[in-house]
């Protein structure tokens, strides 16, 4: 509040009169001075403030106020002194320091005080633009001496603020002042990418001046023409941009002058054009921009002029826009660089968009306006008139570009709306999402019949923004979507259009455009709208300034409520109606069902908001209007009471359309029928016609034909209603969503269809389909008739899929029915083939090469669906080359694989079926036929689905290649044996032809079994009667280029399981980190029962993607709990394998109804009860009861052998000795090789068995490792050995092969079982498996290159998974280096030890250095599992000193690493090898359970062996897992059996006796392979002993010659309890007895005679014990997992607190260092600076050289 001098005097007098003392009066002086300061009486104010200072001299406010008074009087010296005194009294006044610096620089820059105060202010305001300007003034006064410093200052400022226009201009001016024009031009080039600079008028002016000056300097240099042309190109672009900005911000005169300068530049460049180069392309584009800006300038003149002739100006402007629009788009390929191409492309789109819209704008409402303009002004006189209107100078016209340009060839070309829409999308990018530009475009489209493409515009600007949100009720900024922004733009355009109409109604000429050009028109949106749009763009593109984000979010959040019409939105009802109608119209024009549903759904949302307002208006009540609305209210468009009924009808139509889109057809029909309007009639006609089409897609019965007719009649009735209403009232035509012509065309088509039905249905005759010109008759109407364009109809939901989708579905259904029928027919043929010598074949039909006319292409697609169907049964797919067609071959050839039965297949498509001629003569499946047997042609196979196969080939003779049933394995050797002269034959009878030996071994073994069970298709290869017969038979030889691979069966992991339960649910997982439930997936939850072991598991896959989201066993310890607050959800905990590894998860399943939830609970409990009732899975359950005892006994003997083999593999100190014991007897032919060699990747040797099958069971007792199937004895005269090493006699089904990868999940475990049978199908000799022909490769493969890792000659002494970190000195913190296995390796030769670590998967080195004696490991502060050390590392190839840290998961592993690290240092000094540590044999994460649990389970599952003779052999098999874990250790993990024999095992577990465990070997034993001896049995004379030979790293195992010496340690171990154990492995025709040592103190339990019932009882009791232990183990594992999760959370919290503490300490250190350095800089050289040297050296960790330099600086030497 200001006061006058008189008021101040009265107030001062009253106060002084009441003051008791002069001092009291003086203390009021400050207040008096302020009163006089407001009255602008500065002298009186100084008087009173001085009296106050005399009393209160220490008041900094008074000194500051006095300085302000002196500054107003421009007394700078006294003002500075007062300010300085105020700062001394109160140093916190930072702004006053800057004020002093500004005053001193303003007064005298050369004053030394100015430099001091500027530097002081710079410390208080780092990076401030004001400080930069002050420093710039200081350096400017130094002249040329300060240029280098000024250049450095500008560069540093540009690094901080690259968008600052002043700094960029200052740098260019500095270059120009120093005559460095090339550098100035280069700087202009660099800044062109900056959008902020391109939108600055000052910067573009600077660029134009710089480029012009540079071009003038280049004119004298004739040699540098390319540089001159490039600079001219940049100058033209800069002129165009500057012209645009000048038109927007400056007056008409300045715009005229710039346009004339632009004209001169174009004229200068025109003389230098030549050829297709970058300058020519740019010149052409700039010509268009010149004329566009000329037209905008003419309209700008009319906007700002008085007594304007709008007609003359608009006609000249139209001429300019016509020229600009008809300039062709530039050839982008001529422009170098992607940035330049994008820029020119965007400028061209912007030019075409603005020019095209202005042409439509100027010619609106004027007939032949453009034609008149061209005829009047497209000549010399018109060009002169244009020149005179634009340029005021008297320069000759011929020397200007505008005066000399040829404008006589202009066409009267109005822009097409489709082209304009495309140009608009490109122009959006040029304006970077400016709301002004978007609003201007919307206004142009507002007066056009088509809708604006706002959706496409927004997609260009916000690529990743969702189209619609599911949370319309919220106002969170994160929920904003494309539809919100589209609604906003529609509202801005709507209100802006109404405002322009109000202005034009008051004073507007008919020739004045409603909307002026974009650079000329005023702001079209309000400030509130602009600020909201800018805030949205900033948040979405994440460009918010730090600290400003919260403010922007509040702004966006407030307006979202308005846009979504939530709460008190304050929107005008007319705007809501406009939004609803526009969205409904846009949605109907989209092709996607989802887009339609979202747009029409938002339209329904606004209709629901406006209906209550319509009721208020109906009652003639007023609607409140907000004071400052987001969208201004216009009373000219207020809804009247008479319009309410029409709007309500539109709303209900929209509701019905949404029902139709969502698939609720019946509801939509009911709603449409209740509305009596042409829109509802049209929609009903569409629905009924669609129903008729749905029925017409299939073969119709009489009832269906009648129903189809009724639908067509209803369609006809509604179409006739539309035509009648339009005849009576022409206004209803505007409401139709389609043109009236489309209605008439549709009615005509419906009438034609009804006539077809009445004439006897020519489409359907004799129950078969008519071949309509060999084409598929589409059920959709023709586009030329009444095809509903996307903008005129709506699509249907998945409940009622689109027409093409239903046609596809019907086609697929038809194909499936055909395939089913064909399979049934082939099955019948197969069954008949076993009873009759004549083999049923499909009749064939022969089409010659000319059966299809040239140029004809069959119907390849059916609404986009390929018409390729498989017509044969076998599931091996091979593609046929398109060149192998009947029109290209002289005779048909077998171009498909033998499993395909057709060679020349031709499709004839009709509306609902195919006629497929099949020709395949001579290539047969099934039982062989006589060579010259005649076949009679069969009748065509007829079926209901329309497939027909006709035979016109007559009788065929010949013998074909047969796929027989006598062998289960088909090889090419069988084909080669065929010697028939007339049939199809592989190869030639040439002695040099080697045939197919070795190729295709077991080629069809996986298919023939299925072929026997499925259909066998027979067909003859086609032969012409006499045309191609030769004297000799054809000997066709195929030389395959690439052998086809075997077909890979798709395995989903559910093959051997039965589905007990399946229901669609929504699965949730509890996230312990955020303490909330998260959705896991939506799909079918299944309970599967394993057919082998009977264990149930729970499996769930997500819909569509089929990703596993739940996969775990159902155990008896699991219990279902209802989820709180819901009776439709159950919760449980399980060890889940869905992500590959076992992980304890809390899961919850939500069902649709409580009944479904209760059904799931019952099924779950039944599965748990099933677990308790599972019978013991022993071999006697799987064989006939008559041989149970023998089979049980022999299966146990076989398992005993595998148990011994496991003991050998798990012996940690086993060494193989070379022994050979010769004996007599017969054995199987062939041997198996075993090689043990060091593996650089693992810590132990790799055991390789040729022809072996070693599979693992992953320590899961749930999977049965063997199953025995026995056939009757009468059918098995020769028994086969089921267990052997290497190749045995014929028919062996069990062999050791390479080990498979570990199965970790239940789905994988399900596949690990091996079923062994003795059926006749397996009676295949090894010779049959190996025969086949040899193919000479056309392109030989390159030699195998062995990959060297650099660790070949090194011994792994430590290996474990860990996390490596590296200390980064630059940022002062630890950074993760990688996760992988860290190894300690020792070289065998020089005994050097190094640490190597590679990252997982990529195997990139992240640590590689030698361990030296001076290295030391230290624990990191706060944890004992992290070791820190410093080393010269070579991981990146170069030597680099690194500070490393490694973190282990467990403490004992960390301790082990420390121990080995220390041993490595000692070993290098002693030049000795390090002994590998036992704890490194396996990592903790690979161990399924603890050592104690393993020992208990092994003792529980101790097995028995017996000595038997070799005649009766049971079929048995087992699975063994071999894993290499250490250099000297080869371990095997064997699935623990589920049964034990004898009571000692149970007694051993549950009693308190301290008996030592029974073992076949000792971990410390050396010199034995298995830990026991194989000795020849004394009872057998025909046995041979085996031996194991080891040489170096390889050992060979011969199964028939094996002698293993027993270690002496074993003889003394286990209390001498284990002495002798014997077993035998049965062989075919001969047996080999292996003697094991058994305990001597008590007879072996398995020697006792037990009945079957006793065995079952003992097995049952032991199994229950084992199950109890398993349950305890699982509970312990679950508890451990929960504890580990809690520990993990605690550790993460501790790490977070430690990081926060480190960051706080680091920030404090940096602040302290900054203060010390500032003191050092400002102190005088000498002792004061030297006192700070130790602190700086310590904090910066300077090198000696750096310390010396700093000391010199401290003394003032530098």
Curated annotation (Swiss-Prot):
Residues 1595-1618 have a biased composition (Basic and acidic residues). The modification Phosphoserine is found at residue 21. Residues 1037-1173, 1334-1470 form the RanBD1 domain. Residues 779-798, 1295-1309 have a biased composition (Low complexity). Residues 761-805, 1213-1249, 1295-1332, 1583-1621 are annotated as: Disordered. One of its GO terms (biological process) is NLS-bearing protein import into nucleus. GO terms for cellular component: cytoplasm; nuclear pore. One of the 8 copies of RANBP2 clustered close to the chromosome 2 centromere. This is RanBP2-like and GRIP domain-containing protein 4. It comes from Homo sapiens (Human).
């Amino acid at each position: 509040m200001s006061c006058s001098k008189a008021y101040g005097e009265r107030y001062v007098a009253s106060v002084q009169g009441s003051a008791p003392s002069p001092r009291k009066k003086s203390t009021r002086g400050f207040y008096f001075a302020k009163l006089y300061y407001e009255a602008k009486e500065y002298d009186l104010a100084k008087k009173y403030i001085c009296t106050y200072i005399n009393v209160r001299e220490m008041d900094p406010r008074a000194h500051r106020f006095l300085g302000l008074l002196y500054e107003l009087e421009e007394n700078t010296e006294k003002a500075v002194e007062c300010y300085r005194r105020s700062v001394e009294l109160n140093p916190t006044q930072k702004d006053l320091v800057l004020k002093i610096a500004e005053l001193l620089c303003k007064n005298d820059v050369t004053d030394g005080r100015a430099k001091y105060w500027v530097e002081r202010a710079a410390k208080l305001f780092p990076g401030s633009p004001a400080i930069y300007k002050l420093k710039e003034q200081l350096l400017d006064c130094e002249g040329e001496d300060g240029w280098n410093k000024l250049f450095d200052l500008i560069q540093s400022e540009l690094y901080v603020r690259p968008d600052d226009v002043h700094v960029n201009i200052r740098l260019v001016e500095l270059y120009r002042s120093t005559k460095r024009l090339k550098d100035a031009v280069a700087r202009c080039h660099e800044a062109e990418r900056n959008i902020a600079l391109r939108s600055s008028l000052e910067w573009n002016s600077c660029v134009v001046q710089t480029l012009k000056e540079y071009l003038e300097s280049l004119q004298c240099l004739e040699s540098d023409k390319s540089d001159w042309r490039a600079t001219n190109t940049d100058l033209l672009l800069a002129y165009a941009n500057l012209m645009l900005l000048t038109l927007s911000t400056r007056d008409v005169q300045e715009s005229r002058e710039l346009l004339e300068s632009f004209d001169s530049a174009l004229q200068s460049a025109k003389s230098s054009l030549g050829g297709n180069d970058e300058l020519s392309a740019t010149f052409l584009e700039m010509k268009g921009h010149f004329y566009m800006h000329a037209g905008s300038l003419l309209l700008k003149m009319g906007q700002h002029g008085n007594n304007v002739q709008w007609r003359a100006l608009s006609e000249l402007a139209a001429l300019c826009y016509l020229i600009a629009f008809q300039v062709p788009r530039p050839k982008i390929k001529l422009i170098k660089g992607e940035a330049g191409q994008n820029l020119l492309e965007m400028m061209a789109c912007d030019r075409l968009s603005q020019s095209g819209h202005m042409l439509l704008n100027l010619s609106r409402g004027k007939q032949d306006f453009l034609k008149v303009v061209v005829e009047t002004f497209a000549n010399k006189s018109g060009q002169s008139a244009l020149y005179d209107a634009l340029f005021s100078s008297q320069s000759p016209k011929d020397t200007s570009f505008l005066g000399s340009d040829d404008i006589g060839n202009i066409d009267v070309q109005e822009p097409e709306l489709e082209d304009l829409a495309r140009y608009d999308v490109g122009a959006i990018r040029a304006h970077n999402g400016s709301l002004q530009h978007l609003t201007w475009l919307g206004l142009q489209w507002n007066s056009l019949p088509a809708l604006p493409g706002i959706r496409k515009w927004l997609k260009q600007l916000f690529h990743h923004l969702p189209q619609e949100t599911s949370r319309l009720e919220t106002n969170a900024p994160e929920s904003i979507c494309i539809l919100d922004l589209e609604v906003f733009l529609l509202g801005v355009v709507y209100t802006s259009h109404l405002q322009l109409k109000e202005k034009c109604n008051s004073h507007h000429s008919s020739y004045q455009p409603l909307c002026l050009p974009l650079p000329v028109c005023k702001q079209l949106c309000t400030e509130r709208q602009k600020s909201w749009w800018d805030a949205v763009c900033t948040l979405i593109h994440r460009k918010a300034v730090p600290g400003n984000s919260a403010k922007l979010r509040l702004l966006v959040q407030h307006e979202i409520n308005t846009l979504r019409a939530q709460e008190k939105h304050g929107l005008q009802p007319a705007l809501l109606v406009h939004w609803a109608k526009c969205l409904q119209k846009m949605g109907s024009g989209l092709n996607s069902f989802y887009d339609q549903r979202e747009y029409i759904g938002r339209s329904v949302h606004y209709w629901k908001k406006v209906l209550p307002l319509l009721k208020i208006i109906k009652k003639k009540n007023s609607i409140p209007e907000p004071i400052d609305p987001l969208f201004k209210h216009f009373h000219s468009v207020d809804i009247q009471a008479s319009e309410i009924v029409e709007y309500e009808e539109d709303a209900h139509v929209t509701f019905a359309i949404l029902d139709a889109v969502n698939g609720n057809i019946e509801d939509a029909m009911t709603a449409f029928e209740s509305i009596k309007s042409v829109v509802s009639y049209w929609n009903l006609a569409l629905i009924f016609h669609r129903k008729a089409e749905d029925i017409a897609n299939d073969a119709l019965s009489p009832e269906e034909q009648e129903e189809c007719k009724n639908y067509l009649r209803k369609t006809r009735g509604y179409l006739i209603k539309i035509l009648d209403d339009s005849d009576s009232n022409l206004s209803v035509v505007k409401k139709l969503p389609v043109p009236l012509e489309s209605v008439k065309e549709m009615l005509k088509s419906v009438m034609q269809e009804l006539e077809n039905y009445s004439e006897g249905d020519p489409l359907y005759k004799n129950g078969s389909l008519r071949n309509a010109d060999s084409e598929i008759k589409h059920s959709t109407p023709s586009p030329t008739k009444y095809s509903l364009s996307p903008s005129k109809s709506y699509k249907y939901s998945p409940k009622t899929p689109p027409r093409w989708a239903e046609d596809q579905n019907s086609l697929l259904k038809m194909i499936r029915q055909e395939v089913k029928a064909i399979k049934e027919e082939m099955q019948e043929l197969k069954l008949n083939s076993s009873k009759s010598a004549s083999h049923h074949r499909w009749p064939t039909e022969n089409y010659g090469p000319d059966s299809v006319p040239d140029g004809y292409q069959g119907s390849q697609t059916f609404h986009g669906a390929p018409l390729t169907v498989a017509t044969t049964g076998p599931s091996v797919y091979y593609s046929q080359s398109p060149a192998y067609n009947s029109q290209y071959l002289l005779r048909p050839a077998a171009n498909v694989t033998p499993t395909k039965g057709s060679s020349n297949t031709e499709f004839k498509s009709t509306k609902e079926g195919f006629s497929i001629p099949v020709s395949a003569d001579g290539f047969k499946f099934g039982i062989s036929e006589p060579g010259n047997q005649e076949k009679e042609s069969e009748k065509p196979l007829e079926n209901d689905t329309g497939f027909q196969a006709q035979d016109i080939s007559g009788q065929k003779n010949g013998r074909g290649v047969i796929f027989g049933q006598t062998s289960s394995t088909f090889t090419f050797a069988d084909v080669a044996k065929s010697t028939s002269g007339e049939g199809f034959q592989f190869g030639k009878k040439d002695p040099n032809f080697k045939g197919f030996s070795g190729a295709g071994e077991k080629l069809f073994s996986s298919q023939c079994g299925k072929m026997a069970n499925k259909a066998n298709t027979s067909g003859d290869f086609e032969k012409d009667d006499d045309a191609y017969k030769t004297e000799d038979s054809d000997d066709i030889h195929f030389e395959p280029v690439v052998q086809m691979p075997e077909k890979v069966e798709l395995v989903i992991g559910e093959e051997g399981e039965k589905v007990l339960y399946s229901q669609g649910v929504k699965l949730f997982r509890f996230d312990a980190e955020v303490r909330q439930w998260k959705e896991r997936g939506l799909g079918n939850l299944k309970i599967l029962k394993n057919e082998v072991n009977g264990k149930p598991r729970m499996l769930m896959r997500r819909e569509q993607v089929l990703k596993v989201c739940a996969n775990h066993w159902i155990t008896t310890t699991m219990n279902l709990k209802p989820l709180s607050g819901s009776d439709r959800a159950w919760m449980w905990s399980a060890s889940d394998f869905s992500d590959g590894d076992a992980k304890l998860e809390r899961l919850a399943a939500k069902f649709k109804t409580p009944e479904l939830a209760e059904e799931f609970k019952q099924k779950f409990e039944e599965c748990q009860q099933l677990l308790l009732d599972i019978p013991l899975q022993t071999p006697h359950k799987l064989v006939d009861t008559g041989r149970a005892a023998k089979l049980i006994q022999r299966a146990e003997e076989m398992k005993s052998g595998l148990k011994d083999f496991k003991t050998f593999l798990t012996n940690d100190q086993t060494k193989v000795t070379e022994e050979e014991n010769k004996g007599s007897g017969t054995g199987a032919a062939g041997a198996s090789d075993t090689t043990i060699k060091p593996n650089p990747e693992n810590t132990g040797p790799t055991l390789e068995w040729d022809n072996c099958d070693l599979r693992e069971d992953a320590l899961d007792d749930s999977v049965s490792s063997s199953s025995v199937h026995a056939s009757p004895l009468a059918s098995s005269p020769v028994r086969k050995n089921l267990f052997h090493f290497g190749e045995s006699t014929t028919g062996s089904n069990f062999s050791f092969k390479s080990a498979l990868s570990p199965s970790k999940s239940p789905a994988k475990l399900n596949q690990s079982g091996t079923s062994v049978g003795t059926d006749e199908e397996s009676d295949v000799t090894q010779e049959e498996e190996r025969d086949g022909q040899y193919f000479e490769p056309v392109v030989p493969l390159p030699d195998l290159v062995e990959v060297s890792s650099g660790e070949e000659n090194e011994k792994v002494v430590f290996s474990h998974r860990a996390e490596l970190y590296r200390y980064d000195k630059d940022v002062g913190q630890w950074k993760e280096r990688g996760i992988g296995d860290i190894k300690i390796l020792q070289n065998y030769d020089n005994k050097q030890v190094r640490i190597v670590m590679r990252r997982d998967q990529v195997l990139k080195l992240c640590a590689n250095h030698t361990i030296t004696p001076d290295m030391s490991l230290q624990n990191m502060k706060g944890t004992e599992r992290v070791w820190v050390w410093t080393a010269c590392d070579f991981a990146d190839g170069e030597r680099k000193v690194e500070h490393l840290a490694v973190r282990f998961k467990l403490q004992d592993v960390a301790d082990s690493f420390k121990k080995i690290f220390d041993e490595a240092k000692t070993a290098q000094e002693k030049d000795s090898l390090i002994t590998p540590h036992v704890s490194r044999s396996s990592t903790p994460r690979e161990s399924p359970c603890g050592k104690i649990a393993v020992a208990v389970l092994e003792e529980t599952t101790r097995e028995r062996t017996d000595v038997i003779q070799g005649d009766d052999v049971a079929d048995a098999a087992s699975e063994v897992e071999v894993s290499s874990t250490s250099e000297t250790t080869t371990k095997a993990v064997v699935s623990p059996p589920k049964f034990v024999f004898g009571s000692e095992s149970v007694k051993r577990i549950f009693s308190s006796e301290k008996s030592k465990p029974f073992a076949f070997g000792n971990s410390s034993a050396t010199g034995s392979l298995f830990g026991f001896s194989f000795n020849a049995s004394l009872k057998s004379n025909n046995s041979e002993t085996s031996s194991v030979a080891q040489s170096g790293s390889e050992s060979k195992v011969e199964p028939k010659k094996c002698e293993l010496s027993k270690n002496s340690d074993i003889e003394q171990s286990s209390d001498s309890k284990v002495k002798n154990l014997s077993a035998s492995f049965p062989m075919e025709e001969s047996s080999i007895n292996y003697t094991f040592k058994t305990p001597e103190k008590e007879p072996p339990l398995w020697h006792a005679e037990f009945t079957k019932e006793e065995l079952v009882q003992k097995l049952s009791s032991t199994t229950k014990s084992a199950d109890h232990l398993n349950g305890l183990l699982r509970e312990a594992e679950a508890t451990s997992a929960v504890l580990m999760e809690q520990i993990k959370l605690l550790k993460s919290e501790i790490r977070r607190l430690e990081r926060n503490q480190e960051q706080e300490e680091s920030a404090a250190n940096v602040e302290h260092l900054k203060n010390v350095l500032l003191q050092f800089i400002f102190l005088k050289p000498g002792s004061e600076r030297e006192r700070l040297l130790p602190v700086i050296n310590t904090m910066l960790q300077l090198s000696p050289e750096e310390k010396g330099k700093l000391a010199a600086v401290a003394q003032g030497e530098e």
